[in-house]
Amino acid sequence: MVPEYSRFYNILGYNFKDYTLLIRALTHRSKTKKNYERLEFLGDSVLSFVIAEVLYKQFTDLAEGKLSQLRSKLVKGTTLAQLASSLKMDEYIILGASEQGGNKREKILEDVFEAVIGAIYLDSDFATVKKVILKWYQPIISSINLDTIKVKDSKSKLQEILLQNALSLPEYSIETIDGKDHEQQFTVVAVSKDLNLRVKAQGTSRKKAEQKTAEKMIEMLSQQGLHEKK
């Protein structure tokens, strides 16, 4: 065990055999080309599968659509960033000079969380990384109450409203991308041809901008008397 990481290993609940994998998982691209991006890609897939499996087994009466919506909520950026902070990952992130202070940024925390999962998977095996992930997620999963939780994201809700009213789905497109690589601002436009609506919103990622655009369109549809049918 590398002394300076012994505390971090205890927090994670996992001891790396190859600590260079952990270093890579914590290293932002502003520091070096040998950064966490590939591990992030791997960790994203591992996390998605583990969460999908546990939801499938725990909520046996939940339909596929609801399972997908609940999984999306559990693996969204805000959730991952909060988990990363609770595991003190922000204290160990390695940044270049141009990114100093970025260890508290949600997108970086989200990426590092997924990268660490990818690193644990490569350092061990699927059974081990699954056990670690479920330990991290246990408080969240055990507190899920399907009677009170809103699992439907705005794009899914908008889709249901339109389909229930025999209307075509909106088309999303990026209008502009402003700012530096690590501080990009996406402007997304959603167009509903059947309703002759054009809605625009901004976000720090394409996904967030699309969700905000969908929220705006739902509000406009509500004003026209179109609501989701229960």
Curated annotation (Swiss-Prot):
InterPro entries: dsRBD_dom, RNase_III, RNase_III_dom, RNase_III_sf. It is found in: Cytoplasm. GO terms for biological process: mRNA processing; regulation of gene expression; rRNA processing; tRNA processing. It catalyses: Endonucleolytic cleavage to 5'-phosphomonoester. CDD domains: DSRM_RNAse_III_family (cd10845), RIBOc (cd00593). Gene3D superfamilies: 3.30.160.20, Ribonuclease III domain (1.10.1520.10). Keywords: Cytoplasm, Endonuclease, Hydrolase, Magnesium, Metal-binding, mRNA processing, Nuclease, RNA-binding, rRNA processing, rRNA-binding, tRNA processing. Residues 5-125 form the RNase III domain. Belongs to the ribonuclease III family. Digests double-stranded RNA. Involved in the processing of primary rRNA transcript to yield the immediate precursors to the large and small rRNAs (23S and 16S). Processes some mRNAs, and tRNAs when they are encoded in the rRNA operon. Processes pre-crRNA and tracrRNA of type II CRISPR loci if present in the organism. HAMAP family: RNase_III. This is Ribonuclease 3. It comes from Francisella tularensis subsp. holarctica (strain FTNF002-00 / FTA). The lineage of its organism: Bacteria, Pseudomonadati, Pseudomonadota, Gammaproteobacteria, Thiotrichales. The gene is rnc.
